[in-house]
């Protein structure tokens, strides 16, 4: 995990997205002929976000196989389920890819919680050059039993957020008519992107 720290990206989003890319790749080239998996998609549907993500991989044959199933299902039932990205009720279906994504998030947030609590090297590296979005921060905090570890993690994040806020204030000041000639610095531009990363994460 440490080697993947970067100060302007959420470590959990990065690892989860990398794992999902591999899962999509494996699905398209190996699992698309897995009848049980295709049956789950046919019966349960696929969320719009992951439908578009899958489309971006551009495998024409795999899409022909998957969407033939879905369109035939529509002809029989006059319905293709468009799923929310999260399961809303106990009985509701969930997109196969959302389910996998949530599994990866669980793995990486548990790992983060464990290493932050047990490894001084991990803690120091994260404080120096790591970052995490608010959604994954909340998941890590839920998995962290130690109150002192929670406080320490929040303290590290608050310090990072203070630096972001400082740069955002500089951006606002430079939009005053008296300072309009002053260019934004690289750190200020990075802070803008980090603010978005913290609030929204990386899909």
UniProtKB/Swiss-Prot annotation:
Superkingdom, taxonomy of origin: Bacteria
Pfam families to which the protein is assigned, alphabetical: DUF6062 (PF19538)
InterPro entries assigned to the protein according to its UniProt record, in alphabetical order: DUF6062
Name the UniProt record assigns to this protein: Uncharacterized 23.9 kDa protein in xynA 3'region
